[in-house]
Amino acid sequence: MSYQSIIQGVIYSLLSKDELGDFYHNDGYHYDKKTFKCFTFSQLFGKYKIENKHLIFDDDFYFYISSLDEKFLKHIYKTILLNNSLLINKQQVKIKNISILNLQPFIGTKKICIETLSPMLIYSTKDNYSTYYRPSDKESLNFIINNIQDKCLAYHYPIKELVFKIDY
């Protein structure tokens, strides 16, 4: 069941309708003819059942919003604190807890393990034809590195060198 566009809409609804909200919703960050939105989000976590094409959660559920843009995250955080609830697919959902994970960037070389909370989609498009890749395809690593570098440049986030390897 696909609900990602609903969650994306919920996140955008937390932004003000002024220049800031307009920037995040309509403009985004640019680099080399590419446009990047400033955030990503996870799937919904929690126990649920599907009834009439709707997710029915048995208890609490949660999801993650992630961004390099602190201003974006602070705006989302303040809006949630003020409202104490979200409107998700015409359902009022009470917020019980909100936390900010302070993941500091690091300098130098460091081995880290990244687990994606949502599937990665790796593809290239040429002449209106898209080619999709599996993480095990040798081209995937270059696409991932280039994507990270392009996003860092679009966000004006400094990187000197990006060493990246996929272990299976």
Residue ranges of predicted features:
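RNA-interacting cores
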Residues: 1-168
